[in-house]
């Protein structure tokens, strides 16, 4: 599960980058180049993590003659779509993050930028909403899982980027319609993706105790923490240096 999780994220990151390359003809070439560069660097980070810390292509030796299979309680159509939708939402917010970093480098946030970033943010928000909803529906009729919402740490880790993504959608509208909240919108774009990475770190590092169970490896947690520090720390430093020029 752990290795599939990483390969799924890397694949989704690559697909989002390809989408911008193929369908981003309406973007100014410098902005599109910077968005693709940021998206590519994030993808490289996850691919490096996958290859060096959790290689999905590593052979299992010795291979079990007869595996145990999936827990029957998890064999549910809705639950089959729950993780992919969450991953699509988490990774989808990387597009808003990439647009935010590109805007900080350009020193320009305007109505056109807001129109470009909103569809990507909305797509990620819808995917995350579906993922949370499918998981909640499954938990409701599964005995002993706590009902619709248990305020479990892993559930809360998915809720935080959803709340920030909701705020980002509304803030982008203000940028587009009133030319205001520019710095706030950029910060929301950064923090929404930051919470996606922080949630991944907390869940996969074993820091949290949860009714959700995952394969835990402290070394992998440290790798994710390093990726988090570089990605989010660098973007927040750039924000501190460039945001004053975006006020308006």
Placement of each model-derived feature along the sequence:
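Polytopic transmembrane helical bundles with strong interfacial aromatic enrichment
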Residues: 1-248
């Amino acid at each position: 599960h752990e290795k599939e999780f990483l390969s799924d994220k890397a694949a989704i990151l690559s697909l989002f980058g390809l989408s911008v390359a193929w369908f981003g003809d309406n973007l100014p070439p410098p902005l599109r180049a910077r968005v693709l560069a940021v998206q590519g660097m994030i993808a490289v980070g996850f691919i490096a993590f996958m290859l060096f810390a959790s290689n999905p292509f590593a052979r299992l030796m010795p291979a079990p003659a007869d595996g145990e299979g999936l827990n029957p309680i998890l064999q549910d159509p809705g639950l089959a779509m729950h993780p992919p939708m969450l991953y699509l939402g988490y990774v989808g917010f990387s597009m808003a993050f990439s647009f935010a970093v590109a805007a900080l480098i350009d020193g320009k946030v305007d109505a056109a930028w807001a129109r470009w970033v909103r569809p990507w943010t909305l797509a990620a928000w819808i995917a995350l909403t579906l993922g949370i909803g499918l998981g909640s529906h499954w938990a409701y009729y599964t005995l002993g899982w706590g009902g619709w919402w248990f305020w479990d740490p892993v559930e809360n880790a998915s809720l935080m980027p959803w709340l920030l993504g909701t705020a980002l959608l509304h803030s982008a509208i203000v940028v587009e319609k009133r030319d205001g909240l520019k710095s706030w919108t950029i910060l929301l774009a950064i923090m929404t993706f930051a919470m996606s990475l922080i949630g991944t770190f907390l869940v996969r590092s074993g820091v949290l105790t949860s009714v959700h169970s995952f394969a835990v490896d402290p070394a992998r947690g440290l790798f994710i923490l390093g990726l988090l520090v570089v990605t989010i720390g660098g973007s927040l430093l750039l924000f501190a240096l460039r945001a004053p020029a975006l006020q308006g």
